[in-house]
């Protein structure tokens, strides 16, 4: 299923992205897509950790978005 999420890159570039993608992607794949879209020069930190802001939970990069409970409308901050 496709979900629409907001990706917060304030720890890197200060930009915010709205993306539509599959909930079967891993968190690492989400980061790869965000990096390709914004062409950020810094690489993401080891572990590819993210925080789902509206659920106040942290997740590592190897989990899928479904495993993290990410749904349409969530805001994801890249740590």
Locate predicted features:
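Short amphipathic, charge-patterned alpha-helical segments
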Residues: 23-43
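Loop/turn positions that initiate beta-strands
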Residues: 73-76
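Short acidic beta-strand-loop surface patches of small beta-rich interaction domains
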Residues: 12-14, 44-66
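Short, contiguous acidic and Ser/Thr-rich linear segments
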Residues: 11-29
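Short structural boundary motif marking the start of a folded domain
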Residues: 1-6
